[in-house]
C-alpha cells in the first residue's frame, strides 16, 4: 500500500512524524479517511480518535480537535492536545470531567458554556480511549 508523510504537531512537541498508509479522523461533517494521493484539503477536525495505519497495523490516539491539511502527499495536523492511550492520566481525566459537569449545571454565558462543554467532550474522549485500550478494542 502506498504511503504518505504524516506530521501531528502540538504547541510543545511533535506528537508523530512518519510515513503511514492511512489515517482516519473526525472532521466537522463526519469521519474522513486519508490515503496517499488524496486531494489537497484544509479542514477543521473535531474531538475524537486519530487512527493511524502503519505497517498494516492500526494505532489510535485521543485528539482534542484541530486543523488538518493535505497537500502534495503530506498531511499535517495541528492540535492543542493529542495523546496515546497509555499517556492519559485517568484520574486527571475524571477530575476534568467532574469539573466540567459541575460548571455546566450553572447558568453560564454562551462562550463559557461552550468552553466547558468542549472540556467535557475532551475528558469523555480521553476516558473512552483508556477503556477501549483496557478492553482491547
Curated annotation (Swiss-Prot):
CDD domains in the cross-refs? F1-ATPase_delta
| Top-level taxon in the UniProt lineage | Bacteria
Keyword match Transcription regulation: no
Q: Which InterPro entries match?
A: ATP_F1_dsu/esu_C_sf, ATP_synth_F1_dsu/esu, ATP_synth_F1_dsu/esu_N, ATP_synth_F1_esu_C, ATPsynth_dsu/esu_N
Q: Which organism is it from?
A: Caldicellulosiruptor saccharolyticus (strain ATCC 43494 / DSM 8903 / Tp8T 6331)
The UniProt GO MF terms for this protein read:
ATP binding; proton-transporting ATP synthase activity, rotational mechanism
Query: What do we know about how this protein assembles, alone or with others?
Result: F-type ATPases have 2 components, CF(1) - the catalytic core - and CF(0) - the membrane proton channel. CF(1) has five subunits: alpha(3), beta(3), gamma(1), delta(1), epsilon(1). CF(0) has three main subunits: a, b and c.
Query: What UniProt keywords apply to this chain's record, in alphabetical order?
Result: ATP synthesis, Cell membrane, CF(1), Hydrogen ion transport, Ion transport, Membrane, Transport
Please give the GO cellular component terms listed in this UniProt entry: plasma membrane; proton-transporting ATP synthase complex
Q: Describe the family membership recorded for this protein in Swiss-Prot or TrEMBL.
A: Belongs to the ATPase epsilon chain family.
One short Pfam name that applies is ATP-synt_DE
Primary localisation category:
membrane
Instruction: Tell me the membrane topology, using the record's own terms.
Output: Peripheral membrane protein
Q: What is this protein called?
A: ATP synthase epsilon chain
Q: What's its job?
A: Produces ATP from ADP in the presence of a proton gradient across the membrane.
> Taxonomic classification, please?
Bacteria, Bacillati, Bacillota, Bacillota incertae sedis, Caldicellulosiruptorales
Subcellular location(s) per record:
Cell membrane
Ion transport is among the record's keywords = yes
Amino acid at each position: 500500500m502506498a504511503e504518505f508523510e504524516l506530521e501531528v504537531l502540538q504547541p510543545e512537541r511533535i506528537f508523530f512524524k512518519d510515513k503511514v498508509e492511512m489515517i482516519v479522523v473526525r472532521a466537522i461533517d463526519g469521519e474522513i479517511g486519508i490515503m496517499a494521493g488524496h486531494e489537497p484539503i484544509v479542514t477543521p477536525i473535531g474531538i475524537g480518535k486519530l487512527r493511524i495505519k502503519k505497517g498494516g497495523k492500526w494505532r489510535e490516539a485521543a485528539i482534542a480537535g484541530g486543523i488538518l491539511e493535505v497537500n502534495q502527499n503530506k498531511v499535517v495536523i495541528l492540535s492543542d492536545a493529542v495523546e496515546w492511550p497509555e499517556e492519559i492520566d485517568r484520574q486527571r481525566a475524571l477530575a476534568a470531567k467532574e469539573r466540567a459537569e459541575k460548571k455546566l449545571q450553572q447558568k453560564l454565558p454562551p462562550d463559557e458554556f461552550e468552553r466547558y462543554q468542549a472540556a467535557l467532550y475532551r475528558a469523555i474522549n480521553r476516558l473512552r480511549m483508556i477503556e477501549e485500550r483496557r478492553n482491547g478494542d
